[in-house]
Amino acid sequence: MKIKLEIKRLPHGANLPFPSYASEGAAGMDVVSAEDVILQPMQRYPVKTGFAVAIPNGYEIQVRARSGLALKHGIACPNAPGTIDSDYRGEVKILLINLGSEAFEIKRGDRIAQLILASVTQAVFCEVTDLDDTQRGHNGFGSTGI
């Protein structure tokens, strides 16, 4: 299934590619940086992309790390997956963190993350006095094994 998204190029996004799929079966669109940044070890930074997007109601865009950057350099999205809500109209920024031991240079035009369009189901809470019993019950963190 394909859904059209309206995208607005911002002035500092001139001559940069819009997010795109690297292969026919790719789930995520590669997104590039619109600025030069040097991320020091353990530094977090919201990297500009040079575009804004109108996401249809009932959808979100999830922001995920690129596996190669994570494996080779420790570059990750600290709140992965990040969420861009359908009513947000500002510049898309990619929050990155350098978990590596060396500074990492991002150049304008470098692929920095993946964007995934996903449908959203909103919950409606209904307060009750008791919840149904399950085998797991109140057992939480680590209760089902390592």
Curated annotation (Swiss-Prot):
Protein name: Deoxyuridine 5'-triphosphate nucleotidohydrolase
Family as reported in the entry's similarity comment: Belongs to the dUTPase family.
Enzyme Commission number(s): 3.6.1.23
Cofactor: Mg(2+)
Pathway annotation: Pyrimidine metabolism; dUMP biosynthesis; dUMP from dCTP (dUTP route): step 2/2
Stretches that traverse the bilayer: none
Enzyme class: hydrolase
Keyword Endoplasmic reticulum in record: no
Role played: This enzyme is involved in nucleotide metabolism: it produces dUMP, the immediate precursor of thymidine nucleotides and it decreases the intracellular concentration of dUTP so that uracil cannot be incorporated into DNA.
UniProt cross-references to Pfam families, sorted A to Z: dUTPase
The reaction(s) this protein catalyses: dUTP + H2O = dUMP + diphosphate + H(+)
Molecular functions per Gene Ontology: dUTP diphosphatase activity; magnesium ion binding
Alphabetically ordered keywords of this record: Hydrolase, Magnesium, Metal-binding, Nucleotide metabolism
List of residues binding substrate: 66-68, 79, 83-85, 93
